[in-house]
Curated annotation (Swiss-Prot):
CDD domains: Complex1_LYR_SDHAF3_LYRM10. GO terms for biological process: gluconeogenesis; mitochondrial respiratory chain complex II assembly; succinate metabolic process. Interacts with the iron-sulfur protein subunit within the SDH catalytic dimer. It is found in: Mitochondrion matrix. It comes from the Eukaryota. This is Succinate dehydrogenase assembly factor 3, mitochondrial. The keyword Transit peptide applies. GO terms for cellular component: mitochondrial intermembrane space; mitochondrial matrix. InterPro entries: SDHAF3/Sdh7. It comes from Aspergillus fumigatus (strain ATCC MYA-4609 / CBS 101355 / FGSC A1100 / Af293). Keywords: Chaperone, Gluconeogenesis, Mitochondrion, Transit peptide. Belongs to the complex I LYR family. SDHAF3 subfamily.
Length: 129
């Protein structure tokens, strides 16, 4: 995320994105957001889910470290910031994934989501019931 210096105080509205974020909400820099998510996991998740969540967050941030497309960076940071806010507010329990977000996902992302769902439902890696 080499371009994040220019994007530190950018909002989705200034980048042309039609997001539900208010214009006053600035995106956190990647490192601050990463640390915030790990802190929220420590406070809100039970130990098994925390391990799963932490490893997923670490791998996603690592995979997006060298992304140069500003719109991709904004989308990535926006979604992770919304995730952190939901986790902090307890509004996430039992919430379903928005269909419009699911429609925008690639086949690879849907596969990742399915694997994540299976890991959550079957945390000990047991075989099918």
């Amino acid at each position: 995320m080499r371009l994040f210096h220019r994007l530190l105080m950018a909002t989705p509205s200034t980048m042309g994105s039609k997001s539900s974020l208010s214009e006053a909400l600035a995106l956190l820099p990647p490192l601050q957001l990463y640390r915030r998510i790990l802190r929220v996991h420590r406070r809100k998740l039970d130990p098994e889910m925390r391990i799963l969540g932490d490893s997923y967050v670490k791998s996603e941030f690592r995979a997006h470290r060298n992304v140069e497309n500003p719109l991709h960076i904004i989308g990535f940071l926006t979604e992770w910031q919304l995730y952190a806010q939901k986790l902090e507010g307890d509004a996430w329990v039992g919430e379903k994934l928005d269909k419009s977000k699911l429609d925008k996902m690639s086949d690879q992302q849907i596969g990742q989501l399915y694997e994540l769902m299976q890991a959550i439902k079957n945390p000990e890696g047991e075989g099918k019931e």
